[in-house]
């Protein structure tokens, strides 16, 4: 995955059956697909084309999902919405009853409002959320039971930007067996969902 971005949000579903994932997406968006308000294209996506998504919700949502040879038991998800179409991901997860991870990373030198997020939900829908973001000031927020791989000492640091940042998120992902730099490598299957009308 590219390291040159202002903002990047993606999700990871722990599921090996990509066809089941696609069928679940089709069920969730059945009405939009039948009425021609949306289309699903079977294609190998270019995830780097989805970095720096737009903020707000005035544009038509699009998202891309793929599976690669490096992580055959994972499906990756990225969208054209700054918040990563998080609610869509949660709906998919509830249908599949699988683990999901959502990460948001920022380049503090490129954006006025950096946002860092690590979210994990297991198949029982138990949630863990950690966030550090800047509005008028820096804010750190966490909820849910800490996971075994977390370093809780990070959250005691004085500077909020040292409690959760790109490096810590990447570290946590490595501990979960995922190198962010390789999630878009050796893609073997993918789809793109495009909403065309409201």
Feature-to-residue mapping (PLM):
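Charged interaction segments
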Residues: 47-198
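Short, extreme N-terminal segment that most often corresponds to the first beta-strand
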Residues: 1-35
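Surface-exposed, low-hydrophobicity interaction/linker segments
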Residues: 27-54, 123
């Amino acid at each position: 995955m590219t390291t040159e971005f202002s903002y990047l949000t993606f999700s990871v579903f722990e599921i090996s059956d990509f066809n089941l994932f696609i069928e679940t997406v089709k069920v969730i968006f059945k009405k939009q697909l039948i009425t021609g308000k949306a289309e699903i294209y079977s294609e190998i996506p270019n995830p780097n084309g989805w970095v720096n998504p737009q903020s707000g919700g005035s544009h038509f949502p699009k998202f891309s999902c793929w599976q690669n040879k490096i992580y055959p038991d994972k499906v990756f998800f990225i969208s054209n919405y700054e918040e990563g179409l998080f609610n869509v991901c949660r709906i998919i997860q509830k249908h599949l009853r699988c683990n999901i991870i959502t990460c948001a990373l920022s380049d503090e030198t490129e954006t006025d409002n950096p946002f860092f997020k690590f979210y994990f939900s297991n198949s029982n829908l138990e949630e863990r959320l950690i966030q550090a973001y800047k509005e008028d000031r820096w804010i750190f927020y966490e909820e849910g039971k800490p996971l075994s791989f977390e370093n809780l000492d990070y959250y005691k640091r004085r500077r909020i930007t040292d409690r959760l940042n790109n490096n810590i998120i990447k570290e946590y992902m490595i501990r979960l067996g995922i190198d962010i730099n390789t999630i878009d490598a050796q893609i073997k299957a993918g789809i793109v969902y495009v909403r065309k009308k409201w």
